[in-house]
Amino acid sequence: MYMAFAYASFDGDDAYYVVQSVLADQTGVLNRIRPYTGLSTDLDIRHALATLPLWIAYVARMTGIHATIVAHTLLPLIFIPLTYYVFVQIGRKLFSDGSVKLPIFLTLVSIMQIWGNISIYTNETFFLTRTWQGKSVLANLILLVELWLMLELCAREKNRERQEETGSQLPS
């Protein structure tokens, strides 16, 4: 958390997506100015589907904080704990017997997140160094939430089947 807050890393995507957030916040237009040149542009479908920079601009406008600060400082402080919360929930679903497996699972997840920076393309690298980017939010939060929800649905289905079995075995 401290490293994400104090040592924000910058990469090539910042030249487009963070600048897009700044432009949307400062000019009030969405995807109408090319971030590289500052000139007007037609609507680019590929970049128009990237809505996270516009959400960052919205958060910046509502809070009065510069969009770059929101992206590089505020969002890691929100997304990193939120991701670990989802890991806790997944661990609770996988290891619901109350054993020591949940802390071991979370320790292994943390070790993989910290030491998984073996390439610029791993989700661990995106998680800790590019937290504010849509790719990182997808790989490290949205897909994990979907896994958590699927585990939740499976657990509910098992509970429903157990209730039906015990209900049908009761004497009339």
Model-found features: residue ranges?
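Glycine-rich, flexible loop segments associated with nucleotide phosphate handling
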Residues: 129-133, 167-172
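Active-site lumenal/periplasmic loops and adjacent helix-entry segments of GT-C-fold
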Residues: 2-133, 137-141
